[in-house]
Amino acid sequence: MPLNCDTKTAGEISSSIPSGSGSHQPAAQSSGMKIAEIFTSLQGEGLTSGYPTIFIRLAGCNLSCSYCDTPASRQGGMDMNVSEVVAGALLQKPHYVCITGGEPLLQKDEVAELARQLIKAGKMVSIETNGTVPFDDLPSDISICMDVKCPSSGEFSNINLLSDLKSTDSVKFVVGTDDDLQYAEKVIMSHPTKAEIFISPIYGTDYQRIASYILSRNLPARMQLQLHKFIGLP
C-alpha cells in the first residue's frame, strides 16, 4: 500500500500511515499486521541514540501507562502484510530500524518475520517492548529494549524477563517520582542482567534531582534524556 510521504518542519522525512481502520486486505502469502505509522527520525534514546532511524509503530497495547506519549497507537491501525511493511521501511534510507508500539510483541509471529526480512535486507533491528510478553524465542540478532514499568506508570512488567536479555540488549526505567527511583534501584540490584541499563526521566521532570539520586546511590545505570523531544522531532 502506498505511503503518504511528507516533509516535517524539523527537516526529517516522514512516511506516515495514519492511525485508524483501513480497508486494505493482506496478501494471502504474508501475515497481516496492524500498523500505526512508519516514519524516519533521530533515535531519541537507548543504545543507538542520535542515529537516523526508521520507526515502525505497531498498533495495539495491553497496558495503559499514565505517561504514555503515543495513546493513539493503543488501538486502530492500518492492515498491512509483512511484505508491505518491509517495502515501506526500505523506502527510507537509515540503517537502523526500531519496531515500537503500542506493544509490538502482541503481534510476535509477524514481528519476528518482519525483523528477519529487514535483517536480510541489511538493516539493524531493535524492538521496544513493555516486558509483559516473553521474547526469548525471537531471532538472536534482534536488539531488545525492555521498558520496566515503575509505580507511577500504573502498570507492571515481568521483571523475571530481565534474565533473558543479552549484552546487545537494553533495559529502560522511566522515572518521575522518588518511588520510581527506589523501585528501579531495587530491581537493578535484585535482578542482574547482561543488558545495558538506562534510567530515563519523564519529560519535564526535575532532571537534576534524578541525576543526584543516581550519583548518590552509585547505580550501575546510564541516565538518558529523550533527545528527540528536546529538539522537536517525533
From Swiss-Prot:
- Radical SAM core domain span: 48-234
Chain intervals for the UniProt region annotation (Disordered): 1-28
> Which residues are listed for [4Fe-4S] cluster binding in this entry?
61, 65, 68
Q: Which residues bind substrate?
A: 42-44, 57, 100, 234
> GO MF annotations for this entry?
4 iron, 4 sulfur cluster binding; carbon-nitrogen lyase activity; magnesium ion binding; S-adenosyl-L-methionine binding
Q: Which cofactor does it need?
A: [4Fe-4S] cluster; S-adenosyl-L-methionine; Mg(2+)
Q: Where along this sequence does the record place binding of S-adenosyl-L-methionine?
A: 102
Q: Where does this protein act, in terms of pathway?
A: Purine metabolism; 7-cyano-7-deazaguanine biosynthesis
Say yes or no: keyword Iron present.
Answer: yes
Reactions accelerated catalytically: 6-carboxy-5,6,7,8-tetrahydropterin + H(+) = 7-carboxy-7-deazaguanine + NH4(+)
The note on cofactor binding and number reads:
Binds 1 [4Fe-4S] cluster. The cluster is coordinated with 3 cysteines and an exchangeable S-adenosyl-L-methionine.
Q: Which InterPro entries match?
A: 7-CO-7-deazaguanine_synth-like (IPR024924), Aldolase_TIM (IPR013785), rSAM (IPR007197)
Subunit organization? Homodimer.
Query: Which protein family is named in the record?
Result: Belongs to the radical SAM superfamily. 7-carboxy-7-deazaguanine synthase family.
Q: What does this protein do?
A: Catalyzes the complex heterocyclic radical-mediated conversion of 6-carboxy-5,6,7,8-tetrahydropterin (CPH4) to 7-carboxy-7-deazaguanine (CDG), a step common to the biosynthetic pathways of all 7-deazapurine-containing compounds.
Query: Per its record, how is this protein called by name?
Result: 7-carboxy-7-deazaguanine synthase
Q: Which organism is it from?
A: Methanospirillum hungatei JF-1 (strain ATCC 27890 / DSM 864 / NBRC 100397 / JF-1)
